[in-house]
Amino acid sequence: SEMCIRDRPMDIPKLDPATVKYLDFSDVKGQENVKRAMEIAAAGGHNILMVGPPGAGKSMMSKRLPGILPDMTREEMLKSTEIYSVAGLTGKNNPIISARPFRAPHHTVSGAAMSGGGAVPRPGEISLAHNGVLFLDELPEFRKDVLEVLRQPLEDGEVTVSRVAGTETFPANFMLVCAMNPCKCGWYGHPSGRCRCSANEVRA
């Protein structure tokens, strides 16, 4: 017997970065110094660390950073789509990754989830952030071994994942944005004088 197999056409949207909608800096009132620092970081491709009390807007500003990065090129879109496809994160509703990725893993994330893993190696958070932003909120809360995972990709722009099934190297060229409180209670240096942390606690 014979079976006739036909291609099933699928509508692929045009690779047009102009159609991408980002959160906008114009939504944020004030914070001009922070906006300026983020503009400089975005223009130069620099990593950035924000330190401030709770409610200062660190997360809000970070989520708007992709909106001031350059539009993705066709090659960047295809590479990011390839990564997301391998991770099983593409589908009918999002066949093409045309927006700068913004990944914000929780501080309880494991090293394998950050770098990539599985019986068959799959991309982790740092590769899913390729061509975009990796945001680490509450930086001191991340485990040391998880932060160590960032060393190779920050230096080489890629990460190598070794498992029994084989070794894979995934792209991992991202802008690292970190945020943290200045002390355990979060209020050190605030004009309200609410901080009750000791000098040793602040240094820790």
What are these regions (language model features)?
Residues E2-I5:
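Short, small-residue-biased leader/transition segments that mark boundaries at the very start
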Residues D7-R8, A179:
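Acidic, proline/serine/threonine- and glycine-rich low-complexity intrinsically disordered segments
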Residues P9-A37:
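Pre-Walker A segment
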Residues S26-A204:
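Conserved ASCE/P-loop NTPase catalytic core
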